[in-house]
C-alpha cells in the first residue's frame, strides 16, 4: 500500500522506485528534465522536483540547486549540516570537495539517517562508480553521504563531507499534481506539388 500523498514517506517511496534509472539516449535526456522544461541539462534538481510532484509534496523549485537552497533558507526550513538532525524526505544539498565547483551543485532526497554522521540519499544524475562524476553521472542511485566531519564507525569507513545542509519541504496537505502532457506527434511535412512542365510551343510556320 502506497504511503499517504503529501507525506515524507511518500516522497521517499516515489524516489526509491526510480533507483536504477539511466539517462538517454542523449546526454542528460530524462523524463525528469522533460517535466521541468530543463531537458538535456544536469538533472539532479529536476529529479527531486519530479518526485515531489508525484508525491504531491510542496517545496521550492530546486532545478537550479543554489536557488532551491536559498528558498529553504528564506522560508526558515533550512538546517546547516553540522547542526542538522536530518529526517527521511529532507532535501540534501551538496558541494563536493575538490570538484572544481565552489558552490552548491547537487541535490537529493534523504532516505534515512545512519546515526554515524552519514545519511542514505536517493539522487538523480549521479553514479556508484568511485571515479565517476558524482553530480553528473547519468543515473538514479542510493548513496551513503557524510554530513558531519566526524562520521563513520568501526564497520563503515569515514567519508569526505559533501552535504552542506538540508531543506525540509512543507509536508502535510498534498498539493495538486501537475500532469505532464505528452508531446503532440510531429505533423508529416506537406508534399510538394510536382513542378509543372512548361508547355512546348511550336515554331512559327514559314510563309
What would you call each of these model-derived segments?
Residues 8-11, 86-87, 120:
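Alpha-helical scaffolds flanking conserved acidic
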Residues 1-57, 170-181, 205-207:
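N-terminal capping segments
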Residues 24-88, 94, 98-99:
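Catalytic cysteine-centered active-site loop
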Residues 11, 51, 58, 65-67, ...:
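Generic signature of intrinsically disordered, low-complexity, basic-rich segments
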Residues 5, 102-207:
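Aromatic- and glycine-rich peptidoglycan recognition patches
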Amino acid at each position: 500500500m502506497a504511503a499517504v500523498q503529501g507525506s515524507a514517506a511518500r516522497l521517499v517511496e516515489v524516489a526509491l522506485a526510480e533507483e536504477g534509472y539511466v539517462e538517454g539516449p542523449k546526454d542528460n535526456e530524462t523524463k525528469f528534465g522533460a517535466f521541468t522544461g530543463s531537458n538535456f541539462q544536469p538533472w539532479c534538481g529536476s529529479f527531486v522536483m519530479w518526485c515531489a510532484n508525484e508525491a504531491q509534496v510542496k517545496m521550492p523549485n530546486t532545478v537550479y540547486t543554489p536557488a532551491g537552497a536559498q528558498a529553504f533558507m528564506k522560508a526558515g526550513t533550512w538546517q546547516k549540516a553540522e547542526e542538522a538532525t536530518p529526517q527521511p524526505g529532507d532535501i540534501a544539498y551538496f558541494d563536493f570537495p575538490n570538484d572544481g565547483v565552489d558552490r552548491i551543485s547537487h541535490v537529493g532526497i534523504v532516505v534515512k539517517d545512519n546515526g554515524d554522521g552519514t545519511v542514505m540519499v536517493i539522487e538523480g544524475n549521479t553514479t556508484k562508480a568511485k571515479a565517476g562524476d558524482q553530480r553528473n553521472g547519468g543515473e538514479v542511485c542510493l548513496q551513503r553521504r557524510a554530513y558531519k566531519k566526524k562520521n563513520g564507525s568501526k564497520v563503515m569507513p569515514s567519508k569526505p563531507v559533501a552535504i552542506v545542509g538540508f531543506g525540509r519541504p512543507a509536508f502535510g496537505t498534498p498539493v495538486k499534481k501537475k500532469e505532464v502532457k505528452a508531446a503532440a506527434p510531429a505533423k508529416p511535412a506537406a508534399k510538394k506539388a510536382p513542378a509543372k512542365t512548361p508547355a512546348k510551343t511550336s515554331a512559327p510556320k514559314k510563309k
